[in-house]
């Protein structure tokens, strides 16, 4: 029986740094793997069109290399996840969880030094409560 796997990456590269080998094992085992990326780069944060396009191309490349079954993006401003309300984060993440219906979710480390990781951990962890679904 195959599983539905959801990897929650706050920034593109967190999926590989956090559990790249595990994702490849899941894929090899016939599981479906889904990638949820929390953050995105925006011009109003000082990122150039070239940097944004390079990041988008990197996401496409990694998506193809892992053969993700789906890729979802919350498009939160990188380094500014604490500017979003917890209700908004939970609502947006819950929509994706309801769509993917994962059996296993890989989360970032709760005590990571990066504030984006801590905020997003709290939001997705709240989404894993059984009574929400």
Question: Where is each model-derived feature located?
Answer:
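Active-site beta-strand->loop->alpha-helix modules in alpha/beta enzyme cores, enriched
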Residues: 1-133
């Amino acid at each position: 029986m195959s599983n539905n796997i959801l990897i929650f990456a706050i920034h593109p590269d967190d999926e590989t740094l956090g559990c790249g080998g595990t994702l490849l094992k899941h894929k090899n085992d016939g599981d479906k793997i889904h990638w949820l990326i929390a953050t995105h780069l925006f011009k109003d944060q000082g990122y150039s069109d070239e940097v944004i396009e390079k990041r988008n191309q990197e996401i496409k490349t990694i998506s193809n290399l892992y053969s993700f079954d789906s890729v979802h993006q919350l498009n939160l401003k990188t380094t500014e996840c604490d500017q979003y309300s917890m209700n908004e984060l939970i609502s947006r993440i819950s929509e994706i969880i309801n769509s993917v219906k994962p059996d296993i979710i890989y989360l970032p480390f709760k005590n990571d030094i990066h504030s984006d990781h801590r905020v997003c951990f709290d939001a997705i962890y709240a989404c894993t409560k059984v009574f929400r679904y």
